[in-house]
């Protein structure tokens, strides 16, 4: 959707009915009355979501600012300082958002949430380590480790057996050469293993820090009559009614 010259202030609702592009959109969709268009952005200017509400429906129920759904099966909460139509959010939606963005605060009002972060298991990283290059590197190193380990062991054993045979035949030069070859072979193998292991441990450590399961420490009231949800709905409807132009 083209919003024309709308203001992009976090937490604000912009009246874009005067914009020609917006008028065309309203005519095409058949919505009739003008609408509020709220562009939700963070401080760095990145667009987070777009909220569209009709002006003549101040009695609409509050909706989640992330999934834009109402309180169907899950209560709406107001865990931060955002007000109006941006103040309601599902707990599960907010937890997914905080987990994907790797933050613990609201990107609009910068309120810190009380959260509990749990690292994801190693099996999830093995299935999806991140970008395609890292996934390819991990697969190649694992395949090389599986094939090179027995190959290095067999080669070292054969070199040592050959060195013993040459020592029995008093061929010390050949024996020393085979022993040196065995030492060089195992040195290269150990160094490659340590470097690869350290590299992937570093990638896993970074992935573990940025991919955590976030759980909000918020108590939700049980039952169909939720007093917190009722107060939240009343406040949101009052805010929408105040912002509706006459």
From Swiss-Prot:
Keyword hit for Secreted: no
Expression tissues: Ubiquitously expressed. Present in liver (at protein level).
Assigned keywords, A-Z: Cell membrane, Cytoplasm, Endocytosis, Endoplasmic reticulum, Endosome, Golgi apparatus, Lysosome, Membrane, Metal-binding, Transferase, Transmembrane, Transmembrane helix, Ubl conjugation pathway, Zinc, Zinc-finger
UniProt membrane topology term: Multi-pass membrane protein
The name this protein goes by in its record: E3 ubiquitin-protein ligase MARCHF2
Enzyme nomenclature, EC number: 2.3.2.27
Entry's free-text remark on domains: The RING-CH-type zinc finger domain is required for E3 ligase activity.
Pfam families registered for this protein in UniProt: RINGv (PF12906)
GO cellular component: cytoplasm; cytoplasmic vesicle; cytosol; endoplasmic reticulum; endoplasmic reticulum membrane; endosome membrane; Golgi membrane; lysosomal membrane
Binding site for Zn(2+) 1: 64, 67, 90, 93
Taxonomic source organism: Rattus norvegicus
One GO biological process term: antiviral innate immune response
TM segment ranges: 138-158, 175-195
GO molecular function annotation: ubiquitin protein ligase activity; ubiquitin-protein transferase activity; zinc ion binding
Taxonomic path: Eukaryota, Metazoa, Chordata, Craniata, Vertebrata
Function: E3 ubiquitin-protein ligase that may mediate ubiquitination of TFRC and CD86, and promote their subsequent endocytosis and sorting to lysosomes via multivesicular bodies. E3 ubiquitin ligases accept ubiquitin from an E2 ubiquitin-conjugating enzyme in the form of a thioester and then directly transfer the ubiquitin to targeted substrates. Together with GOPC/CAL mediates the ubiquitination and lysosomal degradation of CFTR. Ubiquitinates and therefore mediates the degradation of DLG1.
